[in-house]
Design a protein with these regions (language model features):
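Secondary-structure edge/capping motif, primarily at the C-terminal ends of alpha-helices
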Residues: 150-154, 174-181
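Amphipathic, well-ordered alpha-helical segments in soluble domains
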Residues: 115, 142-145, 167-170
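Donor-binding/catalytic cores of nucleotide-activated saccharide
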Residues: 7-112, 120, 124-134
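Ankyrin-repeat intra-repeat helix-capping/turn positions
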Residues: 2-4
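Membrane-interface aromatic/basic loop that binds lipid-linked glycans or pyrophosphate carriers
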Residues: 23, 180-202
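C-terminal, non-catalytic tails of nucleotide-sugar-dependent glycosyltransferases
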Residues: 141-162, 199-201
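Amphipathic alpha-helical repeat scaffolds of TPR domains
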Residues: 162-174
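Contiguous mid-protein beta-loop-alpha structural module that forms a pocket-lining wall or clamp
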Residues: 137
Length: 202
């Protein structure tokens, strides 16, 4: 399991995840999480409902990135799933860059909507800091790589829509910053990659 240095967990989180994994015979277990800000903890999913996914269902849920998020920190994994997998260096959103690869090695995944992880929202964090086109480009790259992997493995032929959506968002956001050579290069690369999915309806 993983815990970000800014965050904290309930004392029984790993016991909960381990029991969930063993009881369901899965390779990955997931809990939901709180978002902590200003001394308040808010959880979007806290019903206690349980879901068991096949490998492909779990990867599709990661691509949607709403219920099952591309976080490493709210999950417990069998160690063997990380064979041959290395976190990218000098790149933000590294969880998104590898989470789907770890899921690909699993047979089944279980999730229970019981929050056990506390994600701290602070000024200056990766997700909350002032807009940075390079960071959003890293996010786009990771989504693009995830979608290409999903398509190559025949997991979900509609996954390309998420490249289009993320690309449109990035292009829209670049309008907020002063033009530069690096920004122009990002825009060109994003548009080129988006054109690979011209067939997608969104």
């Amino acid at each position: 399991g993983f815990v970000d240095s800014d965050d904290w967990i309930e004392s029984d989180m790993y016991e909960f995840l381990y029991r969930l994994l063993k009881e369901n015979g899965t390779d990955i277990s997931i809990c939901s999480h709180y978002r902590d800000k200003g001394g308040k903890s808010v959880a979007k999913y806290a019903s206690g409902e349980q879901f068991v996914f096949t490998r492909d269902e779990g990867i599709r849920a990661l691509a949607v990135d709403k219920h099952v998020r591309n976080y490493m920190v709210d999950k417990l994994f069998k160690r063997s799933l990380f064979a041959g997998i290395v976190f990218p260096v000098n790149r933000v959103f590294e969880d998104l860059a590898i989470c789907y690869r770890v899921f690909y090695g699993a047979e089944k995944v279980v999730m229970q909507d019981t929050p056990k992880y506390h994600y701290m929202i602070r000024e200056g964090s990766t997700m909350q800091s002032r807009y940075n086109p390079q960071k959003e480009y890293n996010l786009f790259q990771s989504v693009y790589e995830q979608v290409k992997f999903i398509l190559e493995k025949g997991i979900w032929d509609k996954a390309g829509v998420y490249v289009m959506r993320r690309g449109i968002r990035l292009l829209d956001h670049t309008m907020m910053v002063e033009a530069s050579i690096s920004t122009d290069e990002v825009i060109r690369d994003v548009i080129t990659k988006m054109h690979e999915f011209d067939y997608v309806g969104y």
